């Protein structure tokens, strides 16, 4: 009986902890690519053209007045159920082996309203990613009793590569994996356009008051505005 009570209390306490993200007014949109079986398929498209087409699609979405922010990411959006990992090292400090790596475009913090421990806004975090800096959860080195907030501005090794360093732009307010999981160690860095492909997550945040019929309106324009080269949304 006491075990059940303790379990339920722990689950409830975890649920009530800050999530570190906000998904109100956010939508996940699927990217697709025409195959040679389609009569509209454009043969001879290079990988670079595909990267450029996806980038243009993002820009067209950003220009829609009802959309506030648009992002691409890999294994990064809340509740996605998948993750990637890689080591973050500084001097003798090493991140846990299960540290979550989020590859994102700069607007990702704006879509999900990430914030820094020093009060950095989503807009400021986006600018840091644009500069090539990375961001890490404040609990990344908790096994050493070190807060990442105290290491902002320092340079780190990522992916086990000791030939290049990356500047820590901000420590993030801890981001949870889902509602019943405590915040895990994680870091975020910018995904380059040369890595764009249809398997990435396309997420948008619409402006307050614009949710009504948003998906229907977007679908109505998808063929005329959001099929670029062989790339489309669905």
Feature-to-residue mapping (PLM):
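Membrane-proximal extracellular/periplasmic loop immediately following the first transmembrane helix
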Residues: 7-96
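Small-residue transmembrane helix packing/gating motifs
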Residues: 50-52, 103, 130-131, 154, ...
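Short, solvent-exposed loop/turn segments at secondary-structure junctions
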Residues: 34-36, 74-80, 139-142, 162, ...
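Short beta-strand segments
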Residues: 28-31, 71-74, 135-137, 152-158, ...
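Hydrophobic alpha-helical transmembrane segments of multi-pass inner-membrane transport and secretion
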Residues: 1-11, 234
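Acidic-histidine catalytic/liganding microenvironments
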Residues: 61-65, 148, 221, 225
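Hydrophobic secondary-structure segments that place a key small or acidic residue at a functional site
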Residues: 94-185
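Well-ordered, non-membrane alpha-helical segments in soluble/globular domains
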Residues: 47-58, 143, 149-150, 212-216
């Amino acid at each position: 009986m006491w075990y059940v009570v303790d379990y339920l209390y722990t689950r409830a306490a975890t649920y009530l902890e800050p999530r570190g993200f906000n998904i109100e007014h956010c939508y996940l949109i699927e990217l697709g690519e025409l195959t040679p079986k389609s009569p509209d398929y454009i043969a001879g498209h290079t990988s670079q053209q595909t990267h450029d087409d996806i980038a243009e699609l993002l820009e067209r979405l950003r220009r829609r007045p009802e959309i506030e922010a648009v992002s691409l990411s890999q294994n990064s959006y809340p509740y996605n159920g998948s993750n990637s990992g890689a080591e973050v090292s500084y001097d003798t400090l090493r991140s846990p082996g299960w540290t979550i790596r989020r590859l994102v475009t700069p607007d990702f913090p704006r879509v999900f309203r990430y914030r820094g421990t020093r009060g950095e806004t989503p807009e400021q975090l986006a600018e840091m990613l644009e500069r090539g800096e990375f961001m890490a959860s404040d609990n990344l080195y908790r096994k050493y009793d070190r807060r990442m907030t105290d290491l902002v501005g320092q340079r780190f090794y990522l992916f086990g590569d000791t030939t290049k360093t990356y500047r820590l732009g901000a420590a993030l307010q801890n981001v949870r994996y889902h509602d019943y999981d405590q915040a895990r160690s994680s870091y975020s860095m910018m995904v380059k356009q040369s890595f764009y492909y249809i398997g990435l997550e396309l997420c948008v945040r619409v402006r307050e008051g614009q949710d009504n019929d948003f998906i229907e309106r977007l679908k109505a324009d998808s063929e005329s505005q959001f099929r670029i080269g062989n790339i489309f949304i669905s």
